[in-house]
Amino acid sequence: MTVRTRYAPSPTGSLHIGNVRSGLFAYLFARRYGGAFILRIDDTDQQRSSKESLDEILASLRWLGIDWDEGPPDPAYFQSNRLGRYRDAVRGLLKAGMAYPCYCTPEELEAKRRQAEREKRKPVYDGKCRELPFDPEIALPQPGEARSCAIRFRTPRDGETIVEDLVKGRAVFANSELDDLIIFRSDGLPTYNLASVVDDIDMRITHVVRGDDHLPNTPRQVRIFEALGSAPPQFAHLPMVLGMDGKPLSKRHGVTSVFAYRDAGYLPEALLNYLARLGWSYGDQEIFSKSELMEKFDLANCGKSAGIFNSEKLLWLNFHYLKERPIAQLANEIKPFIEKRGYPVPTDDGWLQMAVATLRERAKTLVEMAEFAHFYLSAEIDLDPKAANKFLTSQVLEPLRALTETLDSSPSLKLCDRRHPSDPSQREREAASALQEATQLCGPAASDLIHRCMAASAGNSADPLQLLADSAQIVEKLFTGVLARFNLKLGQLAQPVRVALTGGTVSPGIFEVIAVMGRERTVQRLRAAVARIEAQSRPAAE
């Protein structure tokens, strides 16, 4: 038997996290056993369905890396294009005596429901129209046509319906508790239970993987499968996804749609990994690539209890994938988030890779990374008043002034400034003095270092991270010289410099920050800090 699973979202809104997890499990099960994954669009509710929702659903699945073997854009996989098939199925059930017309009005049914509630009974259809004679050739209402009757399925009154669920185990339902559900509405449209069964038969679905909120529908669907002459597929009902408060995951728990997480700066690999582990386990392993999931996933390892959506765990996973991401890919992915914050997107991909390399050790999302990049991207920054008052004081005025002049006059640092590169002819003229300084600072390795810096600052390097390392090495040597001159420890000068360059007290390593920021902007901000200290140190005018 070839495994065939399906996922059937309705295009009536965004793709919900709990919903897409069911689709993911169906997808992984099909991939594990070399089967086919079918995407079907349940769009019979044309009033609520929209092209925008459909486009978002398809884009969400593609973003997560969930691809389908059969489905859109093929029109055969849209329920709205299969209405004739459902009508044929209903006619067959009517002729076989397995369905009958129901003339009860909505008002009658509502009154009976309220009466059952008052008597503390389960509200089920009482079968008023079940034994009425009818013409099996009765004309079915057309879509949009208001008729006086709906069509109900004739559920057996005696015996039991048994569902051998691959996750929940055996579930036994008394047929007397299963009312005669409506399978074809008076407006000419099929109900979910009929359309789903007919589609599963026609699409040769072998395994139905879905949330356990569908479990009450399952015995009814099993009976419809049998009435249509088809063996039901195997069912796997997954426990619901709950919030940390133990309630069903909803908007009150924060972002719940796939695209909301994308827009919040999560990587698809992180969300896919997290959703796969939400109700499924493989030993103690937490990190799974997509290929590992397809290799190891099995419904037998799905838990029976509800999955708790832990946003901190998802953040932890996202942090892991950010750190493991190829730097060039990460730099490209952060661009929309930079633009959204109102900054011009850097055109130098190499420089952006350098910046991202310093930021990803702290950022848990792409949104955070773009926020942290503000001091690199802004022409001017605002200093945190508390930090500035604490660290930009007269005690560091002379060391700060000395560092400013040291960095400004450094030919090797100027050569490494990819953010503000010199023109080619000037770089050639400056190379000799840069090499001389670098040799004094870095020893015999200086020649290779300077040649790499020349190539990288000109945009010719295949490895911007090497330029970052080389530039940071030069900065460290220059910094160390100033520390020795004033007999200071690193923190005594590094923190004032950090405040001057970034506006705050937390940043990546200060040598790397200077390397990315470049000599020109670094010197500009240090001079502004020196001027601030000088202004505050002057006696107040009489």
Residue spans of the language-model regions?
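N-terminal Rossmann-like or analogous alpha/beta NTP/dinucleotide-binding catalytic cores
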Residues: 1-119, 217-230
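Glycine- and acidic
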Residues: 5-11, 39-43, 203-208, 256, ...
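Acidic active-site catalytic centers that drive phospho-/nucleotidyl reactions
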Residues: 16-18, 42, 180, 193, ...
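Hydrophobic alpha-helical segments in the ANL/AMP-binding
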Residues: 27-28, 61, 193-195, 497
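Short beta->alpha junction loops/turns
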Residues: 46, 79-82, 156, 211-214, ...
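Conserved nucleotide- and phosphate/pyrophosphate-binding catalytic cores
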Residues: 49-51, 55, 64-65, 172-175, ...
